[in-house]
Amino acid sequence: IIKIKADTNQGINCDLRLLEDLLAAIGDNEILHACITYGTKPLPIIIFMALNYVYKVRNNTNIETIIYGTMYSGKKNEPTIYDETALFYTNEMFMQLADAGVSDPVKKVKAMRGMLEE
């Protein structure tokens, strides 16, 4: 487990420093698990940016899990953990559709939903 300290100050310099630290910590042949529960509002976006980059550029680096946890959901002592990994891969799929110049992504999404509902 590698812990990277995120500055609570917000601004482009702090965001870029965190992105730099994340990218420096992730090499080739990695299996990554990320938690986006704690931190400032930009933190999950920065983590997703770093994960997107290393997924595309590093050799044999996989995003295994991205989780978000809630400590309080209106009921005492019922924390919930959400697996956001599918959201990461859905974003990757949309980036590939955009790169391919797909003009009707809604049609593709409907087709994928149909496959999942079968």
Which sequence ranges carry the predicted segments?
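Long, low-complexity, Lys/Arg-enriched
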Residues: 1-31, 46, 52-118
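Gly/Ser/Thr-rich loops at beta-strand to alpha-helix junctions
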Residues: 36-49
